[in-house]
């Protein structure tokens, strides 16, 4: 179960909402997992500003407290950490009841392991105003209920979620969430951007190169790498004689590199001997202009092709250790 959870947490963490140039986001991800016979459910909470994890709470820690995960958060005083710790512990307590409620909605036994997930946050536009707010809930890794874009109504995916929707409509939960997303969330985001401006407002351009991988039947794979960039928003495309190969291109999700930067690659399969007809195009806000690369016309970094695969695995495992967990949802908020 532990390995399954780690894979779940990394998969969700790697799908963080990316913001465009000039935009910023504050997001919180909570996860609660029941574990029969092993004590109380595991609860973990992480917060992100843009692509940077800045706070974390783990109920399995020796002394569970909200802790800084970015150096610039060490500027906050004891009152802040005590307040955030109490908030996290309040979520932990409510999720225990929520797990039991969810099991009853789906007529599940108490013997298995079950997962509640909740994600919420706000995006700031380049003008400093709220661009969008969002709040999503899931059970057993599947969508359950979500706040709509108007921040006033809910979308429930099944009959159990309809029960929750009716309860929340009667309790005016959407109005409270809207007030938080438009007010406190945006105020907090502005504060964190000020605290971490040297890190959060920087731009690190990608280091890019193309690798060559022979295949059978007279074909080769060209893989375009972008490494060491920040923020995470980047565009990689392959073109054949100036025309984009969107459908024929394999593109991986942007991955954290474990050092505060990101990596990504895109590949295409091409006929042997025709490699020079294909160009990779890299666009990132840290670049003065987009890069155009061909196989054999860019100085690769000191990594072998085999090492790159190893690096990708290590990066994902590092992301597990650093990120810890993703999303959480609440069925009943008390």
Curated annotation (Swiss-Prot):
InterPro entries: Ig-like_dom, Ig-like_dom_sf, Ig-like_fold, Ig/MHC_CS, Ig_C1-set, MHC_class-I_related, MHC_I-like_Ag-recog, MHC_I-like_Ag-recog_sf. It is found in: Membrane. It holds the Pfam family MHC_I. One of its GO terms (biological process) is embryo implantation. Residues 112-203 are annotated as: Alpha-2. Keywords: Disulfide bond, Glycoprotein, Immunity, Membrane, MHC I, Signal, Transmembrane, Transmembrane helix. Coiled coil: none annotated. PANTHER family: HLA CLASS I HISTOCOMPATIBILITY ANTIGEN, C ALPHA CHAIN, MHC CLASS I-RELATED. This is H-2 class I histocompatibility antigen, Q7 alpha chain. It comes from Mus musculus (Mouse).
């Amino acid at each position: 179960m532990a390995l399954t959870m780690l894979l779940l947490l990394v998969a969700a963490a790697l799908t963080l909402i990316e913001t465009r140039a000039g935009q910023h986001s504050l997001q919180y991800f909570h996860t609660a997992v029941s574990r029969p016979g092993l004590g109380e459910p595991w609860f973990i909470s992480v917060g992100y500003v843009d692509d940077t994890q800045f706070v974390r709470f783990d109920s399995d820690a020796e002394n569970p407290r909200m802790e800084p995960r970015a150096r610039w958060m060490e500027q906050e005083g004891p009152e802040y950490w005590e307040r955030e710790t109490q908030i996290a512990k309040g979520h932990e307590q409510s999720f225990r009841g929520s797990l039991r409620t969810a099991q009853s909605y789906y007529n599940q036994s108490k013997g298995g392991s079950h997962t509640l997930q909740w994600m919420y946050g706000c995006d700031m536009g380049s003008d400093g105003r709220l661009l969008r707010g969002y709040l999503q809930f899931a059970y057993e890794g599947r969508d359950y209920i979500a706040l709509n874009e108007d921040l006033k109504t809910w979308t429930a995916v099944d009959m159990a979620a309809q029960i929750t929707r009716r309860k929340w409509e009667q309790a005016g939960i959407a109005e409270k969430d809207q007030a938080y997303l438009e007010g406190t969330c945006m105020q907090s985001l502005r504060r964190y951007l000020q605290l971490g401006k040297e890190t959060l407002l920087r731009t690190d351009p990608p280091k890019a190169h193309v690798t060559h991988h022979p295949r059978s039947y007279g074909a080769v794979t060209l893989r375009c790498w972008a490494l060491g960039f920040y923020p995470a928003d980047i565009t990689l495309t392959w073109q054949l004689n100036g025309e984009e190969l969107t459908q024929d291109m394999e593109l991986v999700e942007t991955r954290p590199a474990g050092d505060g930067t990101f990596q990504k690659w895109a590949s295409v399969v091409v006929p042997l001997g025709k490699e020079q007809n294909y160009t990779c195009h890299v666009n990132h806000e840290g670049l003065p202009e987009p890069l155009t690369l061909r196989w054999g016309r860019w100085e690769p970094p000191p990594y072998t092709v085999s090492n790159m695969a190893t690096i990708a695995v290590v990066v994902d495992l590092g992301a597990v250790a650093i990120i810890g967990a993703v999303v959480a949802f609440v069925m009943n908020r008390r």
